[in-house]
Amino acid sequence: MGLFNNFKFKYTRAQLEIFRFSFCLLAPVAVMYYIGTDTDKKLNVPGFWPDPATLNQIPKEPYEIKAELARMKKERLEKRLRLEKKIQEEFGLDLEEEKEKIKRDLALKKG
């Protein structure tokens, strides 16, 4: 106890303000320095980014764009035909007949 009583050092208000200012100024700088050095080793997560070969490739050339549009139209047509077939099988509806009914109803509403 006597050892600590002999060592009485009190901080003045100016010293505390200087410490606070320097801490507030240097702490973010120290964190940024720590994070900024060797980021490949510290923050590297293997397998985080997907392999570029597995990503969708955006067509850039005109022939690639046309081929992609043709593929999309083909998929959409196949899906539509599949759904029409499913409707005909499950509900027994004739789609052409239903389309004609809708056209007649719309013509009656207009006229």
Swiss-Prot record:
GO terms for molecular function: unfolded protein binding. It is found in: Mitochondrion membrane. It is a single-pass membrane protein. Its main location: mitochondrion. GO terms for biological process: mitochondrial cytochrome c oxidase assembly. Keywords: Membrane, Mitochondrion, Transit peptide, Transmembrane, Transmembrane helix. The chain crosses the membrane at residues 18-36. One of its GO terms (cellular component) is mitochondrial inner membrane. InterPro entries: Pet100 (IPR018625). It holds the Pfam family Pet100. Belongs to the PET100 family. Present with 468 molecules/cell in log phase SD medium. Required for the biogenesis of cytochrome c oxidase. Probably for its assembly into an active holoenzyme. This is Protein PET100, mitochondrial.
